[in-house]
């Protein structure tokens, strides 16, 4: 369980001392406001807003977002009203907390309704301040991580709402890491037996493919070393909900879904991305698959995602397993994983650097 001291130490890495102090003050205020309240898990209630703030800190969110995270249930669950928060913490934080409270009251009954009327309400809230949505997504993520304390019927309802509403919104905002964790947690809560079966099958498949994956990894590393190109190479794992959904929607077997090797190469500069692409397209024994190259650096996706995508195959081996490769810069990788939250961080970092320069 996180502590306020541990969180403050992490915040010292990217926030000003006065901002860290303000986050601490919001925590102690929430601790007092929620005094005597407990979570269904038996923990003190303040452990939840602290965990939500910790999630946002991993996205490098600003101090006002973290303060709102600490206070996000105060209006809903205590005697404190919006004016009281405004008096203590200012209009911006009060508006953020009020926005999160209003989103909490939205009821999502069907997928069609959620995509129409209620999604429009969320879009309006996003237009006012995107941070309202980010706090709400972090709130939902922690609730999903601790959903085991809920009754089975509540778990299924919350899991469906997470799959239908919150995971797609995270996807629209380019927050890939958060989206797939929400989807996997919801899958585990809604279909626990299917989740366990696929998890076991994935573990077995990864063991079988370990030697082949190492061969491809070594070939890619040798390729970059030979051309003196900087890059970190890592494997990409398919998440369990994604595997299940592909099996169901595309009528594919588990082996067909898993029969793909996936790698990501992260480098320093945009120019280097294209040089790495040229190098991997000329690998010994491997050839690019025609028609499978995508340049999302030149033409980014609507959510800001940027990367080069290509697919290789082992020439003349009789093994037709595709090797999917993504190539991107560190900043592109951060934005691909954290979406608008990372945009926010880079914008604020650049603003602070400019102020220091002036």
Task: Show the residue positions of the predicted features.
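Phosphate/adenylate-binding "loop-and-lid" substructures adjacent to NTP/NAD/dNTP-binding pockets
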Residues: 45, 84, 106-107, 114-120, ...
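Short flexible coil/turn linkers enriched for glycine and charged/polar residues
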Residues: 59-63, 91, 127-130, 163, ...
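Divalent metal-dependent catalytic cores for phosphoryl transfer on phosphate-bearing substrates
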Residues: 45-201
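Short acidic, glycine/serine/threonine-rich loops at helix termini
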Residues: 79, 107-112, 146-149, 243-247, ...
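Long beta-strand-rich cores associated with HINT superfamily self-processing modules
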Residues: 245-358
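Hydrophobic alpha-helical scaffolding
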Residues: 16, 42, 75, 112, ...
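Short, contiguous pre-domain boundary segments
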Residues: 1-15
